[in-house]
UniProtKB/Swiss-Prot annotation:
Native species: Bos taurus (Bovine)
Coiled coil: none
Gene symbol of the encoding locus: CDKN2AIPNL
Statement: the UniProt record of this protein carries the keyword Acetylation: yes
Family: Belongs to the CARF family.
Annotated keywords: Acetylation
Residue span, XRN2-binding (XTBD) domain: 24-116
UniProt-listed InterPro entries: XTBD
Protein name as it appears in the record: CDKN2AIP N-terminal-like protein
Assembly, per entry: Interacts with XRN2; the interaction is direct.
Residues the record lists as N-acetylmethionine modifications: M1
Length: 116
C-alpha cells in the first residue's frame, strides 16, 4: 500500500508542476527565445506563491511579472536599472543557472578605453 501512496503523491506533484508551467506559459513574450523564457519562467515559478493576487486584486502578480522582465532584460539585453531594483531582482534570482550569457560593454567602459 505504501508504494501506491508514494506513486499517487508523485503523480500529484507532477500534475502540480504541469499546472504551474501551463499557468506561467501565458506570460511568455512573443520575442523571448527558449533560453530566455526558461530562465524567466523559473524566476516566475520560484516566486509565484509569494506574489499571488489576493481575492480583492492588488496586482501582486503584475509586480512579479515586471520584476521577472527587469531581471531578464538586464541579463539578456544588458539593460540597466536603479541599483535598489537590480539588487532586489538579482537576490530573487539567486540560484537560477543561466549558461552562455551575452557580455555587454557599458558606455563608461567604452569611454575609459577611448581615453586611454
Amino acid at each position: 500500500m505504501v508504494g501506491g501512496e508514494a506513486a499517487a503523491a508523485v503523480e500529484e506533484l507532477i500534475s502540480g508542476v504541469r499546472r504551474a508551467t501551463d499557468f506561467a506559459e501565458q506570460f511568455r513574450s512573443y520575442s523571448e527565445s527558449e533560453k530566455q523564457w526558461k530562465a524567466r519562467m523559473e524566476f516566475i515559478l520560484r516566486h509565484l506563491p509569494d506574489y499571488r493576487d489576493p481575492p480583492d486584486g492588488g496586482g501582486r502578480l503584475d509586480q512579479l511579472l515586471s520584476l521577472s522582465m527587469v531581471w531578464a532584460n538586464h541579463l539578456f539585453l544588458g539593460c540597466s536599472y536603479n541599483k535598489d531594483l537590480l539588487d532586489k531582482v538579482m537576490e530573487m534570482a539567486d540560484g537560477i543557472e543561466v549558461e552562455d550569457l551575452p557580455q555587454f560593454t557599458t558606455r563608461s567602459e567604452l569611454m575609459k578605453k577611448h581615453q586611454s
